């Protein structure tokens, strides 16, 4: 079976070593597998949320596209495109927006972080929050669901967005599928073994921290950047600790196992930091030299890159165009020449719309949510160590097994076999809590 994998990179700056080692290089390697169908795109609509400098976005799109190509991406095997060249994506975004619960989007980490910063500063909670930031998860859901990707390689900070895409896709399927599952529910793949590289100051390499090492900078600039890497004060001849060295982590991300072992031993034997930085420079200059030449040649011919991206968009639209037509048909955006269909024939009753949604939390544990017909959360399960345990509880609830709902202040808990397995959010008052308990009982009642 072929697995479809989808990855996007937001073009808001010059690609750096962290982008390459953490996302681009592993994606290119994965695209060469015969059992993988790869979709890689420049998330330039997402870039507009973070950047209001048109020249920077234009330049970054060119640089990131050239980086993928210089890194060895085979555009005959993979589908490589710009998000903004697929008009079906914003259309799908709107269709999904219309079934996305506000309560779901309120829980998005980026939005909550912005609100928390504003509250801490004594400002209006939504000060500076754009609808682009707020609805970012819906656009990401459209990116994923448009091509029915099975697996989405992400960092831990993006797992929630993939889970939200699952929720939104499941909601659309329920409302408009009429027996058909339009959307595959994607799975977040946390790449535990993919490098998260430190920057010049030891923090995660990020444009936000201004601590990056540009991927394809000329040799002189690369050497100067490496010279600025922060190290401890241990003198030449004094043993160094490789495992606490940012420089060693950078070296390890690009060296062979034999080179890493030799470098580790040299540090333990007291290799001077200046010499260690020279070793890192030589390694990177050798490893990236040929790709740097390809990159510079590509940058000099933007028309060629444009042609490649447009060809990739045409390839992607061969999937997107007929699919969006099916989705338009499903929601009722049909030709007036077609016979009218009754609302009951294409839609399930709202009373049956409550659902259990399983997901993997940021800490790696497994949970499930009970959502009502409007997508509002009624219950959040406790953390389970493995998916089978969480699934077993979900299965019992779906089978209509009687659960004990216990009021706890303005919230309530769900108990099975004398054990608390899920908890509600806090409600405004006891009346709201009791109404939610009744909705929960109805949601968990066996459907005839």
Curated annotation (Swiss-Prot):
CDD domains: TrpRS_core. One of its GO terms (molecular function) is tryptophan-tRNA ligase activity. A motif ('KMSKS' region) lies at residues 204-208. L-tryptophan binds at residue 143. It is an enzyme of class 6 (ligase). GO terms for cellular component: cytosol. Keywords: Aminoacyl-tRNA synthetase, ATP-binding, Cytoplasm, Ligase, Nucleotide-binding, Protein biosynthesis. It comes from the Bacteria. Gene3D superfamilies: HUPs, Tyrosyl-Transfer RNA Synthetase. InterPro entries: aa-tRNA-synth_I_CS, aa-tRNA-synth_Ic, Rossmann-like_a/b/a_fold, Trp-tRNA-ligase, Trp-tRNA-ligase_bac-type, Trp-tRNA_synthetase, YegP-like_sf. It holds the Pfam family tRNA-synt_1b. It is found in: Cytoplasm. A motif ('HIGH' region) lies at residues 11-19. Its main location: cytoplasm. Its EC number is 6.1.1.2. ATP binds at residues 10-12, 18-19, 155-157, 197, 204-208. SUPFAM superfamilies: Nucleotidylyl transferase, YegP-like. Homodimer. Catalyzes the attachment of tryptophan to tRNA(Trp). Belongs to the class-I aminoacyl-tRNA synthetase family. This is Tryptophan--tRNA ligase.
């Amino acid at each position: 079976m072929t697995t479809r994998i989808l990855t996007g990179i937001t073009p808001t700056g010059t690609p750096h070593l962290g982008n390459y080692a953490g996302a681009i290089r592993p994606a290119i390697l994965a695209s060469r597998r015969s059992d993988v169908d790869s979709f890689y795109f420049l998330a330039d609509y997402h870039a507009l949320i973070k950047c209001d400098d048109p020249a920077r976005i234009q330049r970054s799109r060119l640089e990131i596209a050239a980086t993928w190509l210089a890194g060895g991406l085979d555009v005959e095997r993979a589908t490589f495109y710009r998000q903004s060249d697929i008009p079906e994506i914003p259309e799908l975004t709107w269709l999904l927006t219309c079934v996305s619960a506000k309560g779901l989007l309120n829980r998005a980490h980026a939005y909550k972080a912005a609100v928390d910063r504003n509250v801490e500063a004594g400002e209006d909670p939504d000060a500076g929050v754009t609808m682009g930031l707020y609805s970012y998860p819906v656009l990401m859901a459209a990116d994923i669901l448009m091509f029915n990707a099975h697996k989405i390689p992400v960092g831990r900070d993006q797992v929630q967005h993939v889970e939200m895409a699952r929720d939104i896709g499941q909601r659309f399927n329920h409302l408009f599928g009429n027996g058909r599952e339009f959307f595959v529910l994607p799975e977040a793949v946390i790449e535990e073994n993919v490098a998260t590289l430190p920057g010049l100051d030891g923090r995660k390499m990020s444009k936000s921290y201004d601590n990056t090492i540009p991927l394809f900078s000329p040799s002189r600039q690369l050497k100067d950047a490496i010279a600025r890497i922060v190290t401890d004060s241990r003198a030449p001849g004094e043993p160094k600790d490789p495992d606490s060295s940012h420089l060693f982590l950078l070296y390890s991300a690009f060296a062979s196992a034999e080179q890493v072992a030799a470098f580790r031993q040299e540090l333990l034997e007291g290799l001077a930091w200046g010499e260690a930085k020279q070793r890192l420079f030589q390694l990177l200059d050798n490893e990236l030299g040929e790709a740097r030449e390809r990159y510079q040649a590509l940058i000099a011919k933007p028309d060629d890159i444009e042609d490649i991206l447009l060809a990739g968009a045409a390839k992607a639209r061969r999937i997107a165009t007929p699919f969006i037509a099916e989705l338009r048909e499903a929601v009722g955006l049909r030709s007036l020449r077609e016979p009218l269909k009754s609302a009951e024939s294409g839609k399930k009753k709202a009373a049956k719309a409550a659902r259990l949604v399983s997901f993997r939390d940021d800490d790696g544990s497994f949970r499930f949510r009970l959502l009502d017909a409007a997508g509002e959360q009624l219950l959040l399960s406790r953390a389970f160590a493995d998916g089978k345990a969480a699934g077993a509880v979900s299965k019992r609830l779906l089978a209509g097994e009687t659960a004990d709902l216990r009021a706890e202040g303005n919230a309530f808990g769900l108990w099975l076999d004398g054990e608390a397995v899920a908890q509600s959010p806090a409600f405004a008052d006891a009346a709201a809590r009791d109404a939610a308990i009744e909705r929960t009982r109805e949601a968990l009642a066996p459907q005839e």
